[in-house]
Amino acid sequence: MSSSKANQTRVCYQPEDTTFIIIASNGPDVMRWRKDKTVPLTEIVDSFQVFTTSNNKGNEGQLITASKQELENTFGTSKDVDVVTKILTDGKIIPHREHGKHKEVN
């Protein structure tokens, strides 16, 4: 399910030093999925891409695609469905906030 940026939610999972992030449609959908796993993942996540941040400091910073090696080392698999399921199940839901909106000062 594709959602507009205004509705996107990050789900962040940090088992050790690296934070892994997926983009979900919105927080209520993630909570609905957590209660009812029969809801298709395609209704919850925008894609099956897993990200980390360029600075490895939580969920802030530029998102970069996590390598297969990072996924294997952390999750024991690089299979996207398994990794996304783990992040959705145990991750922290962070509502999206627009980046780059600046007021011009004269």
UniProtKB/Swiss-Prot annotation:
Alphabetic keyword roster: Cytoplasm, Nucleus
InterPro entries, alphabetized: Ribosome_mat_SBDS_N_sf, Sdo1/SBDS-like, SDO1/SBDS_N
Gene Ontology CC: cytosol; nucleus
UniProt-listed GO biological process terms: ribosome biogenesis
Primary location recorded for the protein, binned into one broad class: cytoplasm
ATP-binding as UniProt keyword: no
Pfam family of the protein (one): SBDS_N
Compartment annotation: Cytoplasm; Nucleus
Function: May play a role in RNA metabolism.
Similarity field: Belongs to the SDO1-like family.
Protein name from the UniProt record: SDO1-like protein C21C3.19
Organism name: Schizosaccharomyces pombe (strain 972 / ATCC 24843)
Lineage start: Eukaryota, Fungi, Dikarya, Ascomycota, Taphrinomycotina
